[in-house]
């Protein structure tokens, strides 16, 4: 019997796959557990429509990420911090502070987990910070750390 898997089934198939399985296995296990549905023409059409919808959403997310990348690369975020001799900061600038400053100064809300700081910023001056907006899109944000008077 041909079935469409609704969820990943170890050793049998992944979500969205169409495979031939034994009738008893399909009727007694896959259908009852909600892991698969029968591969009828109507169900195949619904699966195709769902795949197209997911592709459109993925393309839309990618386009939004590219647009946000263009915006971010034009911006500079200024963060005042207390510093000692030689431009060394007391403490450090974290991704959370960068995200909050970006929101306050430019009105762009960005999740702090998307800001990829290798190490926290510990010195005054300009730093280029990578921001992963999408698995395929990474922007570079300029962060200017100034001395707080």
Curated annotation (Swiss-Prot):
Gene Ontology molecular function, alphabetical: rRNA binding; structural constituent of ribosome
One GO term describing the cellular component: ribonucleoprotein complex
Keywords: Ribonucleoprotein, Ribosomal protein, RNA-binding, rRNA-binding
Keyword match Nucleus: no
GO BP terms, alphabetized: translation
Pfam families in the cross-refs: Ribosomal_L9_C, Ribosomal_L9_N
Family to which this protein belongs: Belongs to the bacterial ribosomal protein bL9 family.
Function in brief: Binds to the 23S rRNA.
Protein name, as recorded: Large ribosomal subunit protein bL9
Source organism (scientific name): Geobacillus stearothermophilus
């Amino acid at each position: 019997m041909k079935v469409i898997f609704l969820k990943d089934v170890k050793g049998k198939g992944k979500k969205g796959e169409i495979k031939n399985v034994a009738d008893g296995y399909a009727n007694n296990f896959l259908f009852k557990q909600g892991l698969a549905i029968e591969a009828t023409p109507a169900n195949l059409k619904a699966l195709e429509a769902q795949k197209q919808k997911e592709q459109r959403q993925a393309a839309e997310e990618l386009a939004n990420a590219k647009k946000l990348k263009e915006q971010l690369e034009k911006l500079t975020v200024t963060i005042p911090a207390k510093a000692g001799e030689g431009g060394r900061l007391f403490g450090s600038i974290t991704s959370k502070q960068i995200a909050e400053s970006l929101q306050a100064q430019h009105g762009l809300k960005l999740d702090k987990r998307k800001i990829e700081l290798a190490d926290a910023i510990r010195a005054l001056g300009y730093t280029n910070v990578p921001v992963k907006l999408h698995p395929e899109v990474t922007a570079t944000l300029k962060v200017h750390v100034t001395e707080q008077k």
